[in-house]
Amino acid sequence: MLWAAALYAGPLDDTLATGRKALSNDGVATAWRLAQQALTDAPESAAAHEFAGEVRFRRGEFAEADAEFKAAVEWNPRFAPAWWGLGRVAECASMNKTAVEDFRRAYQLNPNDPRILAAWISRLRGPERAEALDRYAHASGDPKVLQELRQRAELARALNGREAMALVSPYKAAEVPLRPFVSGATRMRTFGLEVVVNGKPARLVLDTGAAGIVLTHPAAERVGLARVTDATVRGIGDNAKPTGGYRAIAGRLQIGDVEYRDAVISVADRSLVGIEDGLIGSNVLGEFLITLDFAGGKMRLDPLPDYRPGEEFADRTVSPQMESATRVFRFGHLLLVPARVGNARNRLLVLDTGAASTLISTELAAAVGKVNRDDKTALRGMNGKVGDVYQTGNLVLEFAGFEQKNLGMTAFDTWQLSHRLGTEISGFLGLPVLDLFTLTIDYRDGLVKFERRR
């Protein structure tokens, strides 16, 4: 019987190894085929179910991924990658407390797995974090992930125990003017905030697709920021080398009547066109319920129910105010909205008020109709110009109960972002469509309410 089990395990191990290699190289279709083969060959294998969960997660099918990870745990409760997978699903679904518990269980079972270690390091502090970083380096972890984790560690040392982005004004409702900006260089229309950094004014484009605050070099010098650690500023674009820069700490950041101490700010080395003095991601204000009233020219900030600033977020709850909201999935600063384009299966599009148009991936565009090369449309992001741009025929876009007919949509390759996040990004909901709504964003609970203007 042991001999039979060994024969059984050999082909399965080969299938999983080939599948994992395909998945790491973004061969999702091949990985999906091999995952199905593994489940057929070994339906009682925790490893087969766990790998199927990974492929489902990469496809953006989180409920199905969760089911596969749970099946893996049922067959083998000590299979660490399955707990890591459950943590990933819980985290993107705003089940914040559950995610920490799942990642902790995975780490306890296998503290040297690079993927598990990377997920757990961000939750450590002080000497524990330094020791874990050293182990991550020796575990042959992803160099890019290691670089980011080390930069965060350097930033933590510079803060010397102080909390970054500490709210010092009262945690109460506030209203901030939401200004329409028009770029003189690109004529692109955006909305932004007039903020005060270290006592000096700055105009920042409000971008739901951006991470934190990014300033241009001239603006950073004007407000007196000094380099604390190197930083990589990521975004769309085809430059082989990501935009470099540095992180700094501003003593004071004022956004209307809301004030923060020790605000972490990224400064981009590369010239940034059409973004005023910089960008501010709406996630900066994630401790509030954020309402973006584009037509009324204002941003409202309300306290989250049952929350005090500085507390760890609990598992998602839905307040009466947000009962009609759309459930979204959070990956760091990005909010992914379930959407449907044409007759394709449901996909995930980034909520992106900083995008000048709604964009879709070339993969999705090819799945729903004819695609033609478009050499007239110029796309540019934080990482430079996008080289290959395409145009579709007429398509219908559906999300949050809303339907819009489009006389063609712009498409480009989103594989870099999808690879970095570990799930399929099929496009961006840009400002022209988002401007039709008043948006209420709840980062804690992964909810966005789309209220159509009449």
Regions found by a protein language model. Give the residues of each.
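Boundary at the C-terminal end of the N-terminal hydrophobic targeting segment
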Residues: 4-9
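Pepsin/retropepsin-fold aspartyl endopeptidases
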Residues: 13-24, 29-37, 47-51, 55-454
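Acidic/polar, glycine-enriched structural segments that form the non-catalytic walls/loops
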Residues: 43
